[in-house]
């Protein structure tokens, strides 16, 4: 029997299975962290538990620091109640290597965790106290791209945000309101310095975060519900910094294969759960071995020595180039392409799709031929080496059972950056967008996906997306030949990042989409454009 509890980490089962357990004093770490916190993190999901918390765990093991991390969760408090608290804040890390080995490690760097929403005022009040502490250096976030939104797709402020504008700082179900409110506490405590670091896959994430926070603060000052000077405090980088970052580590849902392996080793209580918010989570986190975190070195109150754990610190311009390299060329567009076609062709894993020669040709065409030529070399990471690793090592990893269905989530929010940026670069550099054949196939493929049918005409379940309700009726009318509906979707800059018709790509995308509507049309399109398989 095994228990994820720091008091039982000397049990024989951990040694027998070569689990790397912490050697530092966990109780001491927790005590001093809660007394004088230096690092708070919001967003208690899997990439934090394994990667980001793992970085601090490395520093603790090397005796570079004696502090841990305090965690907050606004979106899904079941994660805190049913995973963090039940497992004594510990995570069993499982790295799924290509060679089939699965090294195990206990990550123990989380000192405590709290829900922080309108139903969890006690947790919020804990953070009020923590934010008023002088030695707090950084607050990091992994709340997904949606977490930074304070407006809906029509540009209107969300109801909970409008409510906060009138009521002023306080606990909310919107994470941006909560962070703004807690920063106001820090301002009132003496304009104490702090860095607020987005670690989400979101281009210019520091800018996106700042704009949401500043907008809330501006409306508070305008409405007279905060003391004058709060906005000025946020805009002073010597007081509050919003460093940009690029993060990359594939961290899929808990794998049944891993659960079975752990149970055979004698570990109990490893069953994954699905919360009411549709979060898939378990006492363990499985992930690939590759990982990258590049951060703008702007921390007005100091920072952890995360470079000793492999983090790259650099300037903002370099972070931006690395992010663009990954998000618009070397990984994310390839992921989205595989996700869209994987859903329609019946695949259950990305690795399985990498055995499809036509899909591999498609992502190579998008990456090497179409996107890389307009990506700036960031120097600190080589783009060709990076994409080589993605295509040859990372995506084919059969142990990473990442699903097309998971990656297809929120695709409408991803397309403008993952594909729209490349189209914009072609236009600004005077290049012929007619050469963007691979990207056209993916955009048409996504429109075809929204019809909710696979290549055999059978119904498929579409992954969650905030624009589904709005787009599906338009796509269906377009599929039935309604010209105005087709034109309206092709001109959606908010969806594609550009007006596809004005960009010279509308006709090609429409043509490919219409071909894909036919029975087995998707396979036929792939054969036509990517060649027959051997």
Where does each model-flagged region fall?
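Substrate/ligand-engaging "lid" and interaction regions
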Residues: 1-534
């Amino acid at each position: 029997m095994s228990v994820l509890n720091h008091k039982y980490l000397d049990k024989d089962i951990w040694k027998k299975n070569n689990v790397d357990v912490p050697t530092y004093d966990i109780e001491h770490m927790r005590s001093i962290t809660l007394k004088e916190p230096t690092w708070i993190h919001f967003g208690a999901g899997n990439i934090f538990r394994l990667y980001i918390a793992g970085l601090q765990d490395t520093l603790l093991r090397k005796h570079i620091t004696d502090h841990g991390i305090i965690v907050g969760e606004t979106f899904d408090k079941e994660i805190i109640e049913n995973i963090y608290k039940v497992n004594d804040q510990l995570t069993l890390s499982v790295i799924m290597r290509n060679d089939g080995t699965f090294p195990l490690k206990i990550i123990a760097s989380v000192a405590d965790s709290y829900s922080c929403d309108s139903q969890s005022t006690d947790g919020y009040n804990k953070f009020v106290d923590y934010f008023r502490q002088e030695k707090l250096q950084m607050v990091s976030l992994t709340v997904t791209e949606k977490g930074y939104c304070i407006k809906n797709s029509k540009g209107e402020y969300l109801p909970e945000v409008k409510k906060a504008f009138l009521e002023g700082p306080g606990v909310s179900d919107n994470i941006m309101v909560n962070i703004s409110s807690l920063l106001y506490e820090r301002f009132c405590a003496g304009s104490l310095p702090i860095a607020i670091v987005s670690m989400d896959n979101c281009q210019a994430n520091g800018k996106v975060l700042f704009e949401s926070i500043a907008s809330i603060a501006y409306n508070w000052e305008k409405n007279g519900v905060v003391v004058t000077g709060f906005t000025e405090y946020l805009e002073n980088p010597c007081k509050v910094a919003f460093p940009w970052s690029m993060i990359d580590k594939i961290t899929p849902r808990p794998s049944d294969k891993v659960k079975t392996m752990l149970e055979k080793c004698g570990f109990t209580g490893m069953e994954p759960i699905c919360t009411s918010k549709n979060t898939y989570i378990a006492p363990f986190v499985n992930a690939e071995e590759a990982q990258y975190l590049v951060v703008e070195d702007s921390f007005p109150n100091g920072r952890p020595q995360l470079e000793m754990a492999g983090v790259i610190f650099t300037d903002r311009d370099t972070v931006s180039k690395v992010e663009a390299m990954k998000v618009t060329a070397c990984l994310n567009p390839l992921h989205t392409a595989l996700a869209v076609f994987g859903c329609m062709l019946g695949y259950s894993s990305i690795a399985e799709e990498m055995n499809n020669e036509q899909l591999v040709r498609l992502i190579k065409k998008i990456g090497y031929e179409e996107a890389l030529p307009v990506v700036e070399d960031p120097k600190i990471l080589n783009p060709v080496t990076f994409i080589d690793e993605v295509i040859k090592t990372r995506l084919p990893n059969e142990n990473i059972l990442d699903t097309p269905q998971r990656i297809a989530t929120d695709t409408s929010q991803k397309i403008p950056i993952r594909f729209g940026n490349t189209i914009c670069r072609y236009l600004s550099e005077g290049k012929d967008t007619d050469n963007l054949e691979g990207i056209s196939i993916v955009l048409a493929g996504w429109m075809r996906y929204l019809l909710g049918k696979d290549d055999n005409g059978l119904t498929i379940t579409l992954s969650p997306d905030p624009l589904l309700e709005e787009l599906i009726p338009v796509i269906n009318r377009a599929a039935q030949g309604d010209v105005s509906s087709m034109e309206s979707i092709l001109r959606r800059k908010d969806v594609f990042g550009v007006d596809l018709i004005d960009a010279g790509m509308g006709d090609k995308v429409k043509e490919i989409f219409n071909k894909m509507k036919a029975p087995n049309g998707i396979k036929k399109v792939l054969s036509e454009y990517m060649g027959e398989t051997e």
